[in-house]
């Protein structure tokens, strides 16, 4: 599998277009990506839910009752988090190219910070 970042993002854009056509949202969606506060808010709330499911998949961080670890479920929940973040970006009017550029810039800044510390 040699999908690029933009391929994953654009696949999710296509999927969201299908979701919108079949089910819709409580707010009108004209074009994706688009800046749509209501739909972005929906996906931010969904991200909170997905993050909770991710935490449940690996309880080793806890002080007690900390033996539960389900790697396959953790991978699934991490994937859900990434997909939902793509949705937040696309309903914030952010394209795949903009997001990839911002990620690259931020990662470069983090590397520079740690190397200069």
Write out the residue ranges for each language-model feature.
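Flexible "arm" and connector segments at domain edges
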Residues: 1-117
């Amino acid at each position: 599998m040699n999908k690029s970042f933009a391929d994953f993002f654009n696949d999710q854009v296509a999927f969201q277009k299908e979701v919108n056509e079949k089910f819709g949202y409580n707010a009108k969606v004209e074009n994706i990506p688009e800046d749509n506060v209501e739909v972005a808010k929906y996906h931010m709330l969904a991200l909170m839910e997905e993050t909770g499911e991710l935490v449940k998949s690996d309880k080793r961080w806890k002080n007690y009752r900390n033996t539960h670890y389900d790697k396959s479920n953790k991978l699934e929940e991490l994937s859900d988090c990434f997909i939902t973040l793509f949705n937040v970006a696309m309903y914030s009017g952010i394209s795949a190219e903009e997001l990839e550029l911002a990620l690259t810039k931020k990662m470069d800044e983090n590397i520079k910070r740690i190397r200069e510390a």
